[in-house]
């Protein structure tokens, strides 16, 4: 359901998968609607972590 969250949900998902270290999860980011993540697995993870930490963690923590 988090995938339907949009930008916030997308970053949140990116941070979770990125932290897990599963490159396969990069495909999940594309489903969220963030083509940037799908553009590059390595680059996407790094960018996702930075963006996720700043926005995803705050929003995600509340949802958890």
UniProtKB/Swiss-Prot annotation:
Ranges annotated as biased composition (Gly residues): 49-64
Start and end residues of each stretch annotated as Disordered: 1-64
Biased composition (Low complexity): 23-34
Pfam families, per database record: Orthopox_C10L
InterPro entries the UniProt entry points to: Orthopox_C10L
Family indicated by similarity: Belongs to the orthopoxvirus OPG024 family.
Protein name: OPG024 protein
Gene name, Swiss-Prot/TrEMBL: OPG023
């Amino acid at each position: 359901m988090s995938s339907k969250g949009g930008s916030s949900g997308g970053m949140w998902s990116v941070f979770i998968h990125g932290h897990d270290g599963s490159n396969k999860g990069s495909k999940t980011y594309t489903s969220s609607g963030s083509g940037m993540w799908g553009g590059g697995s390595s680059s996407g993870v790094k960018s996702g972590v930075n963006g996720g930490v700043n926005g995803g963690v705050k929003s995600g923590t509340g949802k958890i």
